[in-house]
Amino acid sequence: MKTHEILFQTLSQADDYVNGEQLAKELGVSRTSIWKAIQRLEKDGVVIESLKKKGYRLVSGDILLPEVIASNTQLTVTLNEECHSTQLDAKLGMEAHKEGRALYLAKSQSAGKGRFGRDYYSPDQGGIYMSLHLKPQLPPAELPPYTLMVAGAIYKAIKNLTLIDV
């Protein structure tokens, strides 16, 4: 993982401020690298409070960490900074005969597609763009209810993890 990703994990697990010197030592990098990693996180929308003599504290925000998602889900996770469409990424993965159980994520997509190839509005900031490639052992006629079940599960997960009613 990159320095800013490890720093994010460290700050998100801390109960209070973490001293910059302590962070540099834990991560095995310079204080300048910590400062640059904080700037990168802030650029990605993460709010970090900084106080002299105390250190840094994560206030709000989140980032996508494919390694963490993969280790908790048993999925192959691919993250693109930007793509045309995560649906297209998943389709290309299927056409390349990649194994199922793959999650395709993007921070932004320029030509998002939804179900049935419909255009999907996807602004650059604030979205979660993903497509899941599975190979269910069901006949196609039994698959439509799964879209609703997945949507409900995603809603519940976001609400429980963020306390935001989406």
Residue locations for each model-derived region?
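Active-site phosphate-binding and catalytic loops of NTP-dependent enzymes
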Residues: 166
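N-terminal lobe of the biotin/lipoate ligase/transferase fold
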Residues: 2-163
